[in-house]
Amino acid sequence: MIVPLQGAQMLQMLEKSLKKYLPESLKVYGTIYHVNHGNPFNLKALVDKWPDFNTVVVRPQEQEMKDDLDFYTNTYQIYSKDPENCQEFLGSSEVINWKQHLQIQSSQSHLNKAIQNLASIHSLQVKHSENILYVVSETVRKLFPSLLDTKNLSPGSGKPKAINQEMFKLSSLDVTHAALVNKFWLFGGNERSQRFIERCIKNFPSSCVLGPEGTPASWTLMDQTGEMRMGGTVPQYRAQGLVSFVIYSQDQIMKKRGFPVYSHTDKSNTVMQKMSYSLQHLPMPCAWNQWICVPM
């Protein structure tokens, strides 16, 4: 059975229900939070049954997914209470269009078996990335306090070192900055990723510091799942604490708006891991997962 959740009441019930399964449901919880606050990416939620669902998929409306090669748009967020038995639901073409280049995101590594099986059935090549999922300590305290182990918090205030404010000015990104963000984004560097970045800048809060030239020296922004992503610093201004300052500023903006604040970091990126620790971002017991699926 496929049940589309329509109307504010059902979607608010889903958000409340997903809260019980944090942090494993975080990727879907963050997305539904944004669907319930304006839904600028025109997403929809599908469940296998209601109200006692096992699996939920959040995805764009069909009319948004016109480009079969655009996995930045063709993105699905998945949470399942029963990852071993969700394959049939995920295999439905009404739930996931397996004919396109697509991307699946989830805080559940256990979905890998079902996704790999379905990709094999539909002749898709899969690249699975598993990264460290970080959540800001205040979000942990508010949403799932049982995981707040103060032993894991860095000593100190969690604030970054001051920057040279005569040289650098705190600001937000403009759509004209998308090309710069795209150039330094590990998952980007192409026309489709630039369109995605432009859409994020237009619709969600972002933070940057402008260098003496008046262009961004360091930045971070938010995507449609409510995650802080695409942080970067131009090479000549690295190792000056700018990205810590920018991420902390973005933290504050998101907290004021009531958003859950989270991000991910590659397991090999020790510099960002140290920075996350200093800002009191806590690593979660579950991972940040991405599956990029491309037809063979």
From Swiss-Prot:
Identify the Pfam families for this entry.
Gly_acyl_tr_C, Gly_acyl_tr_N
Keyword Cell division assigned to the entry: answer is no
Sites of N6-succinyllysine modification: 16, 127, 142, 169, 183, 256, 267
- Localized where? Mitochondrion
Q: What is its main location?
A: mitochondrion
Return the InterPro entries for the record. Answer: Acyl_CoA_acyltransferase, Glycine_N-acyltransferase, Glycine_N-acyltransferase_C, Glycine_N-acyltransferase_N
User: Sites of the modification N6-acetyllysine?
Assistant: 16, 113, 127, 142, 159, 183, 256
Q: Name one GO biological process term.
A: response to toxic substance
Q: Keyword set for this entry?
A: Acetylation, Acyltransferase, Detoxification, Mitochondrion, Transferase
Q: Which GO terms describe its cellular component?
A: mitochondrion
Give the Enzyme Commission number.
Answer: 2.3.1.13, 2.3.1.71
Its job: Mitochondrial acyltransferase which transfers an acyl group to the N-terminus of glycine and glutamine, although much less efficiently. Can conjugate a multitude of substrates to form a variety of N-acylglycines, thereby detoxify xenobiotics, such as benzoic acid or salicylic acid, and endogenous organic acids, such as isovaleric acid.
Q: What is this protein called?
A: Glycine N-acyltransferase
What gene makes this protein?
A: Glyat
